[in-house]
């Protein structure tokens, strides 16, 4: 009877651990998606306002006129 009780408790712990890790994996995937969406941004086309080169689609900002060239 003692052996059966130990096996039952072990099985319960394994099932709980598996369920817990699945829940964490869902959250981990969701966080990864959120991070990727933060990195995705639109660029400013030629003639649009800019402050630095990284804002322009063609990667060149005329700082004198503050427009993408």
Curated annotation (Swiss-Prot):
Tissues in which the UniProt entry reports expression: Expressed by the venom duct.
Family: Belongs to the conotoxin O1 superfamily.
GO cellular component terms listed in the entry, alphabetical order: extracellular region
Statement: the UniProt record of this protein carries the keyword Ribonucleoprotein: no
UniProt name for this protein: Conotoxin Eb6.1
High-level lineage: Eukaryota, Metazoa, Spiralia, Lophotrochozoa, Mollusca
Pfam families assigned: Conotoxin
More about this protein: This precursor corresponds to allele E1a. Has not been merged with other alleles since they may differ due to geographic variation (see strains in PubMed:19606224).
Coiled-coil parts of chain: none
């Amino acid at each position: 009877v003692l052996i059966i009780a130990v096996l039952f408790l072990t099985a319960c712990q394994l099932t709980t651990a598996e369920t817990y890790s699945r829940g964490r994996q869902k959250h981990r995937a969701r966080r990864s998606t959120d991070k990727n969406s933060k990195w995705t941004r639109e660029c400013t086309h030629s003639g649009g306002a800019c402050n630095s080169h990284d804002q322009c689609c063609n990667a060149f900002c005329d700082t004198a006129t503050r427009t993408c060239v």
